[in-house]
């Protein structure tokens, strides 16, 4: 059982823009939702979780088999935690007149071979190594229930988060972005908007590499499919790309890592099996060794940021 911790604050807020006029009606504009938890003894920099594809922020709160999610690991380590529901996801319902068209919801036949049980299929060479999905027979069903619509283009997803970026950073202050999968391009775009408010980026199996041709868009702007709305260089800060042993993202992540490394940044490509953490697929925050992965990420942040992420008093964090 994990040690308890004390919170000094928790809450949530919709990040709203100007109302949108479409189809002869007035609708809420592009909006996101951010939930936060602040431990009693907090580090000076927070962590912002950015979910992937058709997911939602709840995947960082609990695993599909009911264990504490990554949010709890980072809170126990003293980080204020912010969890984003990107526009059109989670608590921010998709509205086609505002968000544009959405892809059909993915079914079991598409997601199970890629996320839940790749070892039962032969879609990529490393799939047979996967053995970290929870044993709970309903874990896959709970994961499927969390999946919602997503934009038909990566550029649209990027523009959606850029629309809420100013309100987001005004609320949360200095932060470390922890993005996942198709939320990876959104994380780079947020860093370009946030500038020096983004201390570091931890990209968990981020989608894309320069020039990659994807059904949702070609990566023509570094690691994004569209030019950044912000002026900052998203890679001008410590960056880590994290890859599991049994995922289809290994080659793409290696190409993305080579690009970031060539920029001369403070960078590490964290291949989990090289740290004694093996058998993982794409949903690193959901699998049975998720807590060990979170500890590895915390250690990387501490090494990379040093005093900028120092812990004020370890005794005050634990309850």
Protein language model regions, located:
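Gly/Ala-rich beta-loop-alpha elbow adjacent to hydrolase catalytic centers
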Residues: 178-187
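Conserved alpha/beta-hydrolase fold motif
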Residues: 177-178, 201
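Short, surface-exposed "cap/lid" segments of acyl-processing enzymes
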Residues: 41-129
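The feature captures the conserved acid-bearing segment of alpha/beta-hydrolase catalytic domains
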Residues: 206-271
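Glycine-rich His-Gly loop
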Residues: 49-55, 181, 206, 244-245
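N-terminal cap/lid segment of alpha/beta-hydrolase-fold proteins
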Residues: 1-42
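Conserved acidic catalytic loop of the alpha/beta-hydrolase fold
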Residues: 134, 148, 155-176
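Catalytic active-site module of serine/aspartate enzymes centered on a nucleophile-bearing elbow/loop
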Residues: 277-279, 283-319
């Amino acid at each position: 059982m994990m040690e308890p911790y004390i919170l000094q604050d928790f809450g949530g807020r919709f990040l709203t823009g100007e109302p949108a006029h479409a189809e002869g009606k007035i609708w809420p504009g592009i909006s996101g939702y951010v939930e936060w938890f602040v431990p009693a003894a907090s580090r000076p920099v927070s962590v912002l979780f950015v979910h992937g594809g058709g997911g939602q922020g709840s995947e960082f709160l609990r695993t599909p088999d009911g264990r504490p999610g990554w949010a709890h690991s980072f809170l126990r380590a003293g980080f204020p935690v912010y969890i984003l529901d990107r526009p059109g996801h989670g608590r921010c319902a998709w509205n086609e007149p505002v968000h544009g068209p959405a892809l059909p919801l993915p079914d079991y036949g598409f997601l199970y071979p890629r996320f839940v049980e790749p070892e039962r299929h032969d879609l990529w060479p490393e799939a047979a190594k996967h053995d970290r999905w929870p044993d709970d027979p309903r874990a896959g069903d709970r994961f499927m229930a969390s999946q919602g619509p997503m934009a038909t283009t990566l550029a649209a997803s990027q523009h959606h988060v850029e629309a809420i970026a100013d309100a987001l950073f005004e609320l949360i202050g200095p932060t470390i972005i922890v993005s996942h999968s198709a939320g990876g391009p959104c994380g780079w775009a947020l860093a370009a908007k946030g500038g020096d408010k983004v201390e570091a980026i931890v990209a968990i199996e981020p989608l894309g590499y320069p020039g990659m041709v994807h059904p949702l868009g070609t990566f023509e702007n570094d690691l994004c499919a569209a030019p950044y709305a912000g002026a900052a260089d998203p890679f001008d800060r410590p960056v880590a790309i994290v890859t599991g042993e049994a995922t289809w993202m290994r080659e793409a992540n290696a190409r993305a890592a080579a690009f970031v490394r060539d920029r001369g940044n403070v960078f590490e490509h964290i291949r989990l099996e090289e740290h004694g953490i093996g058998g993982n697929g794409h949903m690193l925050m959901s699998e049975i060794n998720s807590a060990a992965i979170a500890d590895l990420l915390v250690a990387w942040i501490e090494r990379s940021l040093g005093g900028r992420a120092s812990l004020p008093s370890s005794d005050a964090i634990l309850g």
